[in-house]
Amino acid sequence: SNSITNDSKSYNGLINVFNSPISEFTINSLANGCMPLLVDFEDISLTNNSIVNWQWDFGDGGASSFQNPIYDYTSDGNFSVSLIVTDANGCQSLSTQLNSIDVYKMPVANFLADISFSCNQTELVTFTNNTLGLANYSWIFGDGITSNLVNPSHNYALGVYSVSLIANVGTCIDTFVRNNYIEIGAELNSDFI
């Protein structure tokens, strides 16, 4: 004969349920600029228990386990930063700041003109921008006129002019100056024997 028994056991005790920490952080320095860019991060996570572990992901392959790291971004790009905190109970929390870091390559300004010397009383000069890196441009033609074009042309009157090109990406700025570069209405000095 088959007999069925109902065995039951009961346990007395407490089941502890812990609140998870709330992962949060701030950036205490410039979050955009030229590479290399040094960025100061501060953990401001909330918890009822002590946090025992920090796992930072800086978005460029770099990581840290310090509570308040300072990180050096050495490549250009836009980066998201994440922090996972673990409290003494083993509870974890993740926070991410998307696209929070912008690192730019420093532009290197340079240019040439198609004409730098002319005997004419006026001359249309075309400039070729040879700047390394993408940038915004400000030209100063030396006669009170400016331009923001990449490769501008400018009509010069009689005189000698210094020309400047300012290239900027965010807060990264480079200036290139050619002093006394454009000479219009100059006389040729020829000595014939």
Task: Describe every region a protein language model picked out.
Residues S1-I193:
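Extracellular/lumenal mature domains of secreted and surface-exposed proteins
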